[in-house]
Design a protein with these regions (language model features):
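Membrane-interface transmembrane helices that cradle and orient dolichyl/undecaprenyl
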Residues: 3, 38-57, 65
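Short helix- or helix-capping micro-motifs
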Residues: 11-16, 62, 66
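Short acidic/glycine- and proline-prone juxtamembrane loop motifs at membrane-interface regions
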Residues: 20, 26-31
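Hydrophobic/aromatic-rich transmembrane helices and adjacent perimembrane loops
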Residues: 24-25, 74, 185, 208-257
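Transmembrane-embedded, aromatic-rich helix segments that form part
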Residues: 35, 56-62, 71-89
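Transmembrane-lumen/periplasm boundary regions of multi-pass, lipid-linked membrane glycan transferases
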Residues: 75-190, 328
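Luminal/periplasmic acceptor-recognition loop/helix of membrane-associated glycosyltransferases
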Residues: 309-323, 331-404
Length: 404
């Protein structure tokens, strides 16, 4: 809908073998639904020029995108308002269109509960409780967090993600192959430059330029990265436009080579495809072998089995890794009412200091024979060993206990 068929094929190929997309698909992080929702929303939005019913599907996708990641709350309205403005400017949509206002109602219905959540939790209105739904006052709202970084620090961080292809987090970016392979940024930059040039040329001629929509989402991702300190999954809305631009960049590169080396036209395309395929095979080999070991601790390998042993002991369970309390609560299946009645909050609100017989220690606890300890990889076990504790290894976790 935006580029030609050859670019679409290249973009589809890049998406299938792209490290970022593969890791995003395998790691079930809820925020990683956002890029797909925005992509479907954009697709149906563009198809609306052919048939007005697609606007309703676009509104549905953009409405669902609001629930995929709080980060997009600000950018979905921007994308929709500027997109509608551009279609009206180009005469492809009229302000009085029933499909336009019908779609606006759909988005508004999806957005209304989120607006109420903000109004309740910022103290503008009281809690809402009805027979059909309720909106409580939450103990903690992540949208209230501030990042405390300057514009230039954010820019440096974003540049590291886009050009060095890493945010330093093993679960987000494989250090050896990057997010779209080391050479991939060259084709993306070519595609970006070509997209901007094509849009500017068509704008001056008053021609319809679908590149506008691709650049719009890219700029939203760029603005997000410049105004907050992001990591790969937080700025994930930028990567699908970049991959499409990468496909466009390959097509531009192959066309240029065909112009100066007409006899080698086919081989240039084959060479580009082979370069990506070889890189993909190398990445796949790394991903299912070395990376699995490197990332085991980050994904708390063995935690479930260690907790099962701890529950059998009937003793107090100490966990010394911060930030994993939701996973612990899920594994032990603690009833909600027990959690609410026994939780004690720490200074790192909303993480509890304890709940039931579970203790979440920000610092490693001292040996206690009345408790068992689940320690992260690399923890100092010497004090426990000196006290006669035994150690069992479960994945990346050490299960430490005293045997009577």
């Amino acid at each position: 809908e935006i580029m030609d068929e050859e670019t679409a094929l290249w973009a589809m190929f890049l998406l299938a073998i792209n490290p970022w997309h593969i890791m995003m698909s395998r790691w079930g992080l809820e925020s990683n639904l956002a890029p797909g929702m925005l992509l479907f929303g954009l697709y149906f939005f563009l198809r609306g020029s052919e048939s007005r019913r697609f606007y309703f599907l676009s509104a549905l996708m953009y409405g669902l995108a609001l629930y995929s990641y709080a980060v997009v709350w600000m950018y979905v309205p921007i994308i929709l308002l500027l997109g509608v403005w551009y279609l009206i400017r180009e005469g492809r949509l009229t302000p009085k269109s029933r499909s336009l206002w019908g779609s606006a109602v759909i988005v508004a219905v999806f957005a209304a509960p989120l607006v109420l959540v903000l109004l309740v939790n910022y103290g503008y209105i009281g809690e809402i409780q009805t027979r059909f739904f309720s909106i409580p006052k939450l103990d903690f709202l992540r949208t209230s967090q501030t990042n405390g970084y300057t514009f230039w620090q954010n820019a440096e961080n974003l540049a590291g993600i886009l050009f060095l292809q890493s945010d330093g987090l093993i679960w987000n970016s494989p250090t050896k192959y990057g997010l779209y392979y080391s050479f991939g940024i060259l084709f993306i930059m070519i595609g970006l430059a070509a997209s901007i040039h094509s849009f500017c040329r068509k704008w001056k001629r008053r021609e319809y330029a679908p590149e506008f929509f691709l650049l719009l989402q890219f700029l939203c991702g760029l603005f997000l990265g410049l105004t907050s300190h992001v990591n790969v999954n937080r700025v994930n809305i930028i990567f699908l436009p970049m991959l499409i631009m990468g496909g466009y960049g390959i097509e531009i590169f192959c066309s240029f080579c065909a112009h100066i080396l007409p006899r080698w036209t086919k081989w240039v395309s084959v060479g580009a495809a082979c370069l990506y395929l070889v890189s993909f095979l190398c990445f796949a080999q790394y991903y299912f072998t070395e990376y699995r070991q490197e990332s085991a601790a980050a994904f708390d390998s063995g935690l479930k089995d260690a907790l099962a042993e701890g529950e059998k002991s009937g003793k107090t369970i100490h966990i010394n890794k911060s930030g994993i309390y939701p996973k612990v609560l899920y594994y032990v299946q603690m009833p909600v009412d027990e959690y609410i009645n026994t939780r004690v909050f720490s200074d790192w609100h909303p993480m509890p200091k304890s709940a039931g017989n579970l203790y979440f220690d920000m610092e490693q606890a001292e040996p206690d024979r009345n408790g068992v300890f689940i320690l992260e990889e690399g923890a100092d076990l010497s004090a426990f060993v000196q006290e006669g504790f035994e150690v069992e290894k479960y994945g990346s976790c050490s299960y430490v206990y005293y045997s009577e």
